[in-house]
Curated annotation (Swiss-Prot):
Keywords, sorted A to Z: Cytoplasm, Methyltransferase, rRNA processing, S-adenosyl-L-methionine, Transferase
Major subcellular location class: cytoplasm
Residue ranges that the Swiss-Prot or TrEMBL entry lists as coiled coil: none
Matching HAMAP family: 16SrRNA_methyltr_H
GO CC annotation: cytoplasm
Catalytic activity field: cytidine(1402) in 16S rRNA + S-adenosyl-L-methionine = N(4)-methylcytidine(1402) in 16S rRNA + S-adenosyl-L-homocysteine + H(+)
Its EC number(s): 2.1.1.199
Entry's family note: Belongs to the methyltransferase superfamily. RsmH family.
InterPro entries: RsmH, SAM-dep_MeTrfase_MraW_recog, SAM-dependent_MTases_sf
GO terms for MF: rRNA (cytosine-N4-)-methyltransferase activity
Protein name from the UniProt record: Ribosomal RNA small subunit methyltransferase H
UniProt organism field: Sinorhizobium medicae (strain WSM419) (Ensifer medicae)
Gene name per UniProt: rsmH
Length: 341
């Protein structure tokens, strides 16, 4: 919830590395930062969006749940002339950090950052041997805790729903047999086992472990629950005319964002299950296209941009109707949240 999922470019003179996040131009076009505006960046990461927003003259309140990102960003704070505040916080709590008069914009870049993936000791990548951790902060259960202790039925739900893994049952049952002999400790332990269960075929575009690792990361960090809570928080924190811009990389993330904007713009209709939908004033109006994806040029330059989707809305003056997870029609969210708790 990939905080900044872009690549990195080095300055020609050998100066500092500048992080270029995904869909930067598109994010700025939707967000419209300018002098006098206060923008909240809910996923600071390596500071790519925050830096560009500062360059446009706006003030930035930046959040990140990863203490490593907070520490690394202190030099940006010092160089900002007081226009950047960097706060260790989950973005679900963004309304707590908004000024009383409201925010002019909120940007969220959802998921795991390239910085986190690149650090083997964080345990996010199956391509690097490291501890099976995947936590964005030191709190909570690790991926190893889940793999070694969860019921097989729960592993199947996690891999199947969050990872959309078709072989969830086979993988979970094989994990159960293996952990009875020795616990899983490293990323390679788990990746190697998955490869034996679902060996890679020549036509496969992704590694066999991709979906399971993605599912564990999303579960360990409650990424979908955090995203849903952040959308409702942004609705409360934005002033009329303020803009909410969200970049997501996973189909379930995009489904949540799309559903939120449809519901809040009054475009969500009934269904055979919920045929009667009470009309209410729209709290968001659309910005540009319903969904923006990376250009072919950006996708070829940065493979991580291929799955990126941007959605945005402008806050109206209508009062927030409050948080309601039922609008997403994802009962699995509450079920998995109870499991994580």
């Amino acid at each position: 919830m990939v905080t900044d999922q872009g690549g990195r470019t080095s300055e020609a003179d050998g100066g500092p590395v500048r992080h270029i996040p995904v869909l930067l131009e598109e994010v700025l076009a939707a967000l419209e930062p300018a002098p006098g505006k206060v923008i909240l960046d809910g996923t600071f990461g390596a500071g790519g969006y925050a830096s560009a927003i500062l360059d446009a003259g706006a003030e930035v309140i930046a959040l990140d749940r990863d203490p490593t990102a907070i520490a690394a960003g202190q030099s940006m704070v010092s160089a900002s002339g007081g226009r950047l505040s960097l706060i260790h916080s989950r973005f679900s709590g963004l309304a707590e950090h908004a000024p009383a008069e409201g925010l002019d914009g909120v940007v969220l870049d959802v998921g795991v950052s390239s910085m986190q993936i690149d650090e083997a000791e964080r345990g996010f990548s199956f391509q690097k041997k490291g501890p099976l951790d995947m936590r964005m902060s030191a709190a909570g259960v690790s991926a190893a805790d889940v793999v070694n202790r969860a019921k097989v039925s729960d592993l199947i739900r996690i891999f199947g729903f969050l990872g959309e893994e078709k072989q969830a049952g086979r993988i979970a049952r094989t994990i159960e047999k293996r952990r009875a002999e020795a616990p899983f400790e490293t990323t390679r332990d788990l990746a190697n086992l998955i490869e034996t269960v679902t060996p890679r075929k020549a036509k496969d575009k992704i590694h066999p472990a991709t979906r399971v690792f993605q599912a564990l990361r999303i579960f360990v960090n409650d990424e979908l629950g955090e995203l849903a809570a952040a959308l409702f928080a942004a609705e409360r924190a934005l002033k009329p005319g303020g803009r909410l811009v969200v970049v997501s990389f996973h189909s379930l993330e995009d489904r949540i964002v799309k559903t939120f904007f449809q519901d809040r713009s009054g475009k969500a209709g009934g269904s055979r299950h919920l045929p009667l939908v009470t009309a209410r004033a729209a709290t968001f109006a659309p910005v540009g296209k319903p969904m923006v994806s990376a250009s072919d040029e950006e996708a070829s330059r940065n493979p991580r941009a291929r799955s990126a989707k941007l959605r945005a809305g402008i806050r109206t003056a209508a009062p927030s109707p409050g948080a309601d997870l039922s609008i997403f029609n994802l009962p699995e969210l509450a079920s998995l949240a109870r499991l994580g708790g």
